[in-house]
Amino acid sequence: MNIDKDVNYFTRGNASRKDMLKDKKQQYKNKVLTLILYFVILCMFAIITILTINKIGNYPWGSETFGYLYKGNILYDSFINGESFISYDINWYNGTQLLKGSEPIPYYLLALINLLTNDIYVTFSVFITLVFIVGGTGFLLWGYYCNRFKLGLFFGILWFFIPNNLRVLFSEGNLQLVIINALIPYLLLIYYKATRENKFKNYVFLSVIICIISLNSMHIVIMILLALFLLAVFDTIRKTYFGKKFFIVLLSLLGILLSAFWLVPALGEGLLNSNKSEVIQKLTQNSYSLLDSISPVLRFYNVEVYYFGLSFFLVGIFSVLFMNGRRDIKNLSFYGILIFIGTSNVFIKVLKNIPFSEFLIFSKVTSIAIALILVSILLWRNLRKVLIVIICFILLSDSMLTFDLIGHNREFPEGLVYSLDYASEIATQRIGILDLSQYGALPSYYLKYGVKGKSSNQVFGWQWKSANTSENIVMINTALENNYYLVMFDRCIQLGADTLLIKKDLINDFNYLDECANPNGYIKVYEDTNDIIYKYPIEGTFGTTVKFDGIAIGKYAENICYSFPNFTKGDKDYIDDYTVSELSEFKAIFLSGFKYRDKKKAEDMLKEISEKGIRVVVDSNELGDEEFLGISSKKIDLEDNYGEFYFKGERVKIGDFPEDEKIFRCSYLLGGKDDNNNYINVDTRMLEYMKYYNENLVFLGLNIPYFEMITKDDVALEILEEATNMESYILPDRKCVNIQIDFESNRIMVNSENNDVIVPIAALSSFETIEGSYQVFNNLVNLKSKELVIE
């Protein structure tokens, strides 16, 4: 045996292993240095981009941007005062819990940046720069993982310029979604690694990033988890890593649990409360056909149009058709295309029949679809370089066209700001901006932080659904949109708005607007090409006393208040939650979409009230088959119009249904006494729409209150006047009275010479009464003592 030879063999083997380890360390070092170099390049592009964005000015123009900046700025003010949370803000919506039911990360991030900049506009520029760098770094890490640094850098830079990402940032101004879009490359990378590596750290990172996304938007994280779940299901069919992927999706739920410290209280405050019909209606209005969504032309006519990107769609189709080898990589592009299909208007029609469809908004996860397509290109190892160059060129060209259209901030908006300055100068209590949100969130921000030397409280704000006065806001906006100016002015006075700024292009009849303003006490004091300003001539803070002759009870009862301003919407939808004495204070009671806890008690109450000479009208559209006082209703769909219509025994001409409701769903009446005076003829059938239980208790069918509200039909209005025994377009007896309102730390102190004054402060459920007493009236504080202290 040659010992020297064996020793040399093992020596050479050890040396070889050492060289291999040394080479691996050197390769790792080179990769890290390359990553750092490319990160520096990415940061340079981010700086150049923000300078380009601010070339004209540094004022954002997105419809929601200033709402985020407002909350970030007011949270910054709290930091300066040594507090880390906003419990109450008096400026918006007659007082609101500003972060109630809101995810916190966007506002805290803006506030923290503002601690460094002390300028909210510079803060927004820093925010954009960070979004560019964070999102781009995600693709740099993909390049590191795939060992394709140059392509990773290109996609990292491109990610900011994706048409959908630009629209969300600049046009929508949805900073929650902007942050989430920046995190999507990390989410997909960690998810992809977790399915292929049995490393605990991947599961931890995935839970952490889901937690961060949850604290940005709970609605979006639901869609993201659904997207990951469907991807796992799709791969199950293809038999690639299906068991592990399901397990990983389940582990992702831990991320939501990590955010429970904030989200659990927020859920109790309505974080996930969504009106399904409203969401589906909005989705239908803002959805497009698949061809329109990839049309590169439409964005030139409307910068807010949803554009997936023709180039990204074609690249996705290309990779699905021509990628050879690993099927799981091809699946990424295929699944991205499926998400895109989920955004189409055809799919929305199917979606509305699915349970919880209000959460299935695929357009919100468009960036996931695009990221999946980009990742599939990164993982496509045998793709020729010339094809990579062509793909990069068409993606960049498509994206830069959108950037040229919307990728900019603007100059100081002097025209609107002049009107806001004037309104703030003359306002003594609150300003109402009646613009149907067309001015975006800018007025809400500017009236707090923009007017020099003065901060003006407002009736409106931003994200009205979280406001305690949301029902009041909806009624005023509906009145403005449908030209019910009389009730609009009256309800603005009730909310304490002594100054109103109205956007002129929302007004159809300026003479009628003035005619409705005068009896409410408003005087026109300013007008330019865009706005009109009305002022109520009163100094100091004030409340109102009011006497309504009618009360509307139920989910849909408010419809009657537009033509009958003398009706007030009841604060409770259950009839038997009221007392007979409470309801006996009114001359008429209108019920629509009402409820009851005890049917017999409710019936007895209405009989007793009607026997006192008080008119009771029951809108039977939601009554259904269950009899109420012996009367029920049956659904029917009518087309174009009511047909032969008889009122008081005579045939009358009633108007057609609106264009968007040509198929009109309503109900006719069954049971009770035959009337034979108020009916329609349908297919030789006589269908009654008005029945009297007794002289003062009337049942009304055919959805006439709603029909009258949307059409202002004269015959329908006459029927309502007959049924309610009330005259239309009569204001309630309202008077303004001066009161003293003081805010001190977390206390609100009210002093009045009168009791029963409606104070224009939203009655929050979190209020605690320290001194005095109050009740809730139309979501406002109704003073029941001359002094009131709440905190």
Locate the predicted segments by residue.
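Membrane-embedded transmembrane-helix bundle of lipid-linked glycan/lipid transferases
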Residues: 4-411, 415-422, 427, 484-486, ...
